[in-house]
């Protein structure tokens, strides 16, 4: 049976991640509060941001920006979108 979590993005019980997505306290918190569905959506959005804004992940400012966007995305706050992107209905 899949591990279930109360997803902070969708505000409902959904299947959780198999492993923490990153090390440390932040990874543990995400593991306990973010669903597999929300995390997969974030990864897709993150890829769009990296490509659209041509972010260099070796740059600490780019990593900070992505971390801020991740928090906004997962907390249903206003987050940056790729220019011209129209989400599927």
Curated annotation (Swiss-Prot):
Query: Which keywords appear in this protein's UniProt record, sorted alphabetically?
Result: Iron
Source species, domain of life? Bacteria
- One matching Pfam family, short form? Iron_traffic
What are the recorded GO MF terms, alphabetically?
iron ion binding
A biological process from GO: cellular response to oxidative stress
Q: Which SUPFAM superfamilies match?
A: YggX-like
Q: Name one GO cellular component term.
A: cytosol
Which Gene3D superfamilies does this chain map to? Fe(II) trafficking protein YggX (1.10.3880.10)
Note whether Protein transport occurs among the keywords.
no
Say yes or no: keyword Phosphoprotein present: no
What does the sequence similarity comment in the record state about its family? Belongs to the Fe(2+)-trafficking protein family.
User: What this chain does, per the record?
Assistant: Could be a mediator in iron transactions between iron acquisition and iron-requiring processes, such as synthesis and/or repair of Fe-S clusters in biosynthetic enzymes.
For this entry, the protein name equals Probable Fe(2+)-trafficking protein
